[in-house]
Each structure stands twice: as structure tokens, then as C-alpha cells.
């Protein structure tokens, strides 16, 4: 049965459902000077032996997605031989590739060909091209908010040179892999599921899927297009979770860290990251089952935060995105069963409201602090952005999209304009001003 602990203790002390201690980010993130230090723009060089590497990697992206080719990687004065490289992404690969632009996302596996090879203790490097972010700041700004409340991949900026030529400025995003799990949970061998459909944005005849946690029957094959089990096993455990969500909700807390899910939903909603389970598109999360038997929700891929490239999702009323309902009332019944069932429960809805209010107060109300952080990041990145001839947007848009929306083809949400309008919406919710409990005389 779900443990209904004292709400005030949950909100102020930091202990979650089932007695599990909530996440403390201050002890886990990268030390100054490391790969994810935001005070610097790192530089990486990749040299392929095969001069036709690009056509090989483009072909494998569509026909053999896990195929990698060797390259020599240089970073911070060190050279690494025979790293395994493939292209990654979905729309962020397809859109530049369709235009003949070489600035596509990279996935680099340090130990693919040489066992135990690492780059500053990392086995995998994931480079996002910030293709739909004029500011180069949305992924990192969002990650810095998520990490206050959830186990969250780190992100930093990196100059990438390929075959001796500057390809562009990339966002270096931490992989959700065994190293991440060890860092965040002090364990790494549980079931890990990437909740992302298999279809390719520009692929022909690719299967459709939707990781919405609906029950699709007892055959695991029904789930293959919607989920990607990264561990050696896990389909049975995933289906057990989905079955409980849909048919045994009262006992869901026995298998899911519900408090962590509610934190994820709260941050998604507060910063309008609509590429999420309770956003416009259902994806971009992992589920990891820890040794205590609970699945943990892990957010990832934040480039569409602050409305991102989804600003114009409602063609007839594009500004409606700022008032995107925080409780999922815009969805059809059973469209998002986990969200629907949690927020139909009075206790979990109260806990969700508390988390939403916390994110609003701690991370969005002080707009001067948010702006200062973005300005510092952009100042650090400025030269690398100027020299990036493969970027999609102009330097004027690099600056202006921080403060205001950009309408060109798609709508690209401005970071501060989104925060200001979202704050206005959130401040109008009665739940934002409910009195908080006071705790005293605790032994």
C-alpha cells in the first residue's frame, strides 16, 4: 500500500515515499575543472581513418544504428586511439543532415574497441548540436534546474574539430549509463529502460511507438517500439510496472518511487519542457530500478525546455503554450495513465502541488539570477559561437532569443519571455499560495 507519510515532513525534511532519502545534488556533481565545468569551453578533436566517414555514418544511422567506426580522439592534451563513433539524435540529426549541414550530433564510446579506455573516467561522450536552440543555453539552464530535485545528466559546452576543421559548438551531455547510475544511486546493475520510441524523424517506414505507460498486453513484443531496455534484462520488470500503473494503483508505491516522478512532472511543467511525459510529446525519460525494488524516473534531453522549438504547437493560438495545463486536463482519458492516476489521488496531487510551488519559488521567481547565469554562459561561449559557421541561427538571434520569442519557420521560445509568462500563469494558481505547514519540537 502507498505510504502516506506526513505531508509537512515530506515537504520540508526531504524524505520520500517508502522512507527513501531524497536526492542531494550537492554531493554528486562534477568538481570544478572537470569535463562538465561551465566556466570553460572545452575542445575536442576527432580524426577518422576513413575519409568517407560521413557517408558511412549517415548510412549506418538509418540502417545499422549501433554501428561505430574507429577514430582518434584528442582532448585536454591526451590522445585516445580507436574510440567508437556513431551519429545520434532524431530531429536534431535529420534536420541538418537533410540540408547537407555536417553539424550533426555525435555519440562516442571510449571503450568500444579498446577495453577499459576512458576520458576522465567517462566511457561515453554524447555531443548534442543545439540545432534548434539559438541561445546554446536552454539544455544547460534546464539541467541546472532539474538537478536541484532529481538525478540529472550534467551538461557543458565543447568545441568540436573533425578532420582538423572546426565543426561547431556542441553541448556535451552526460550519458545515462552505468557510470551515471553508480554516481547517482551507488549501484549500477538494476533494470534500465530508455523510454523513447524507435521511430526516426526522417526515417522511411520506421515503426511508431509511444512510451506512455499504457498496458498493451502480456506480450513483451508489443512494447519494443516504445521502450529500449538498456540492461541485460528488464522487459518483465517494465511490464510489471505498467500493469501496476493501470490495474493495481493502490500498490504502485511498492514498485515506483512516486515522489521522484512527481518532482519530474513538476519541473517539466514549471519550465515548459514539453518534450516529456506530461508535455506535448511523450518521451525523454529513463526508468531505473534500484536495489530496493523501486523504479526511479530520470529526466534527460532538455533542449526543448522553455517551450523550445514547440512554441507554435497550437497553430491557431501559439501563446496558449504559456498556460499549458499543469494537471493534464488537456489529455484524453487514459492518454497518460501515470499522470492521470497520480493527480486524481488527493494526496499525490497535494504533494505535486508542493513540488510545483517549490520549483516556482526556488528556480523561476528570481529572474535576475536566471538571466545572470545565462549571460555568464553566453559570454563564455561567445567566441565559439561566432566561429561556428554551421550553426542554424545568427548572432543576433543568439542574444535576442534569451529575452524574446523567435518566429522563423517553427516558433522558438525565448527563455526569459517564457519564464515571465509562465510565472504569471503559475502565480495565478490557487495552489501556489496555500499556507505551508510549520514543524517544531522534532526529536
Task: Give the location of each predicted region.
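Extracytoplasmic
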Residues: 39-43, 68, 103-105, 122, ...
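Structural recognition of the beta-strand scaffold that forms the well-ordered cores
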Residues: 45, 84, 105-109, 124-129, ...
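Conserved oxyanion/phosphate-binding beta-strand-loop segments in alpha/beta enzyme cores
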Residues: 71-129
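Bacterial Sec-dependent N-terminal signal peptides
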Residues: 1-21
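A conserved alpha-helical element in kinase catalytic cores
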Residues: 131-151
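Internal "kinase-insert"/substrate-recognition segments embedded within catalytic cores
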Residues: 105-115, 122, 129-130, 148-157, ...
Amino acid at each position: 500500500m502507498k505510504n502516506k507519510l506526513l505531508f509537512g515532513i515530506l515537504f520540508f525534511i526531504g524524505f520520500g515515499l517508502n522512507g527513501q532519502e531524497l536526492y542531494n545534488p550537492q554531493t554528486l556533481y562534477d568538481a570544478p575543472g572537470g569535463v562538465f565545468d561551465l566556466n570553460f569551453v572545452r575542445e575536442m578533436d576527432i580524426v577518422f581513418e576513413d575519409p568517407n566517414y560521413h557517408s558511412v555514418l549517415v548510412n549506418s544511422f538509418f540502417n545499422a544504428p549501433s554501428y561505430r567506426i574507429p577514430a582518434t580522439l584528442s582532448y585536454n592534451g591526451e590522445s585516445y586511439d580507436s574510440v567508437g563513433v556513431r551519429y545520434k539524435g532524431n530531429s536534431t540529426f535529420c534536420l541538418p543532415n537533410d540540408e547537407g549541414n555536417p553539424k550533426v550530433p555525435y555519440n562516442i564510446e571510449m571503450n568500444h574497441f579498446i577495453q577499459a579506455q576512458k576520458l576522465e573516467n567517462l566511457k561515453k561522450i554524447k555531443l548534442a548540436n543545439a540545432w534548434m536552440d539559438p541561445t546554446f543555453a536552454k539544455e544547460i539552464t534546464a539541467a541546472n534546474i532539474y538537478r536541484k530535485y532529481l538525478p540529472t545528466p550534467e551538461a557543458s559546452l565543447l568545441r568540436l574539430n573533425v578532420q582538423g576543421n572546426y565543426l561547431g559548438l556542441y553541448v556535451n551531455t552526460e550519458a545515462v549509463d552505468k557510470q551515471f547510475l553508480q554516481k547517482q544511486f551507488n549501484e549500477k546493475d538494476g533494470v534500465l529502460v530508455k523510454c523513447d520510441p524507435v521511430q526516426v524523424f526522417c526515417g522511411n517506414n520506421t515503426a511508431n511507438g509511444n512510451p506512455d505507460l499504457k498496458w498493451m498486453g502480456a506480450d513483451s513484443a508489443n512494447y519494443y517500439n516504445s521502450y529500449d531496455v538498456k540492461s541485460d534484462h528488464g522487459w518483465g520488470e517494465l511490464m510489471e510496472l505498467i500493469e501496476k500503473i493501470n490495474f493495481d494503483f493502490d500498490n504502485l508505491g511498492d514498485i515506483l518511487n512516486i515522489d521522484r516522478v512527481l518532482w519530474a512532472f513538476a519541473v517539466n511543467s514549471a519550465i515548459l519542457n514539453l518534450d516529456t511525459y506530461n508535455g506535448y510529446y511523450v518521451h525523454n525519460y529513463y526508468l531505473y530500478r534500484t536495489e530496493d525494488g523501486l523504479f526511479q524516473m530520470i529526466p534527460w534531453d532538455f533542449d526543448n525546455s522553455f517551450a523550445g522549438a514547440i512554441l507554435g504547437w497550437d497553430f491557431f493560438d501559439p501563446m496558449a503554450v504559456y498556460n499549458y495545463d499543469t494537471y493534464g486536463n488537456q489529455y484524453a482519458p487514459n492518454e497518460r495513465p501515470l499522470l492521470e492516476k497520480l493527480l486524481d489521488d488527493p494526496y499525490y496531487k497535494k504533494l505535486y502541488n508542493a513540488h510545483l510551488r517549490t520549483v516556482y519559488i526556488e528556480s523561476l521567481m528570481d529572474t535576475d539570477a536566471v538571466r545572470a547565469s545565462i549571460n555568464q554562459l553566453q559570454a563564455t561561449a561567445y567566441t565559439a559561437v561566432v566561429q561556428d559557421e554551421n550553426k542554424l541561427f545568427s548572432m543576433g538571434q543568439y542574444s535576442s532569443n534569451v529575452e524574446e520569442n523567435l518566429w522563423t519557420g517553427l516558433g522558438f521560445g525565448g527563455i526569459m519571455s517564457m519564464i515571465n509568462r509562465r510565472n504569471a500563469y503559475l502565480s495565478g494558481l490557487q495552489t501556489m499560495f496555500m499556507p505551508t505547514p510549520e514543524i517544531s519540537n522534532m526529536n
